[in-house]
Design a protein with these regions (language model features):
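Short beta-strand segments
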Residues: 7, 87-88, 117, 143-151, ...
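A gly/proline- and charged-residue-enriched helix-loop-helix capping module
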Residues: 109-127
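Catalytic-pocket segment enriched in acidic/His residues
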Residues: 13-14, 50, 54-57, 67, ...
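N-terminal non-catalytic cap/leader segment that marks the start of a structured domain
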Residues: 1-109, 113, 282
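A generic local secondary-structure boundary/capping motif
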Residues: 4, 74-77, 103-106, 130-140, ...
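Short acidic-glycine loop/turn motifs at beta-strand connectors
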Residues: 9-10, 19-24, 150-152, 221-223, ...
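Non-heme Fe(II) oxygenase catalytic core, chiefly the N-lobe of the double-stranded beta-helix
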Residues: 125-162, 167, 172-175
Length: 297
């Protein structure tokens, strides 16, 4: 199943929908039948667990009125995250190696996942503009990533059980201000500018992705291919990420994890390349979907 957060083009509050086809969305606010979650809130749906999934399957199998996708505005599927977005750095060997060439000091490949976060306010819609302010940063860079959405929460999750805690997947671009990263000598600030985490275009539930460890992912800028890889090249696989992140830290339903980016980022190119106002950034993960974001308002 593919789940969206949308609002009608004519206006109205955002609400949760279920894609019936590639071109139609069922408005869960109008289905009735006493859903076991708040149909205006994706976090509530995810927290609803198996009862919510069972109810959605009944909706998907029934005959329901739907709205044309072209008549709605898609928001980030989780538009108001309850917590920061968890991220994994240096999780593709080729990206670590390209970064090593651009770094002034030698850094050893981590023996454990390198975690950091992006502020909750970074989350942006799948087709919304990414803010650009040259007085803040002139080195805005791209990073395609597979986004993982936690379903059942947990703490100290065994690696063998980790995938049972996945609700679904989405596309993420971990947009990064490289000059700010260097200025502060850490990741958080340079990766936490408002609107710097386009997410979506929907959540694909975990049962619909046969092998999340074998998905092509790519970035295009103005139509030119910049990143092209596959999640099979993840250095730390998804179960390891979940298990290590949950050590002593309770993961909650709706938590978002960006699992790392492959090579091809702008700062490691010769000469370096960065996004400019008017550029169109396209971010795609096989089996999930495509984000298309213009740089600048």
């Amino acid at each position: 199943m593919r789940l969206v957060t949308f609002s009608p083009q004519a206006g109205g509050a955002p609400r949760v929908g279920l894609l019936r086809t590639d071109d139609e969305v069922i408005d869960l606010n109008h289905v009735g039948g006493n859903p076991p979650f708040d149909p205006a809130d994706m976090n509530s749906l995810i927290a609803g667990g198996e009862k919510a999934i069972s109810w959605l399957r009944d909706v998907a199998s029934g005959s329901r009125d739907a709205v044309a996708l072209g008549q709605v505005r898609l928001h980030a599927p989780i538009s108001n995250p309850r917590r920061n977005v968890y991220c994994v750095g240096w999780n593709y060997l080729d990206h670590f190696e390209e970064g090593a060439k651009a770094r002034p000091q030698k850094v050893d490949l981590p023996a454990h996942p390198a975690f950091f976060t992006k502020a909750a306010g970074t989350v942006n819609g799948p087709y919304d503009a990414i803010p650009f302010d040259a007085s803040v940063s002139t080195q805005i860079d791209w990073e395609v990533e597979l986004g993982l959405i936690i379903g059942p929460g947990g703490k100290n999750i065994p690696e063998a059980d980790a995938m049972k805690h996945v609700f679904g997947y989405a596309v993420i671009n971990d947009v990064s201000a490289r000059d700010i990263q260097r200025r502060h000598n850490q990741w958080f600030k340079g990766k936490s500018l408002d609107g710097s985490c386009p997410l979506g275009p929907w959540i694909v539930t975990s049962d619909a992705i046969r092998d999340p460890g074998n998905l092509r992912l790519s970035t295009r800028v103005n139509g030119a291919l910049k990143q092209d890889s596959n999640t099979r090249h993840l250095y730390f696989k998804l179960p390891r990420i979940i298990a290590e992140l949950s050590l002593g830290l309770t993961l909650e339903p709706g938590d978002i994890i960006a699992t790392g980016t492959p090579s091809g980022v702008g700062y490691a190119r010769t000469p370096p390349e960065f996004l400019k106002p008017g550029d169109v950034l396209e971010t795609e993960v096989e089996g999930i979907g495509l984000l298309r974001n213009r740089i600048g308002n």
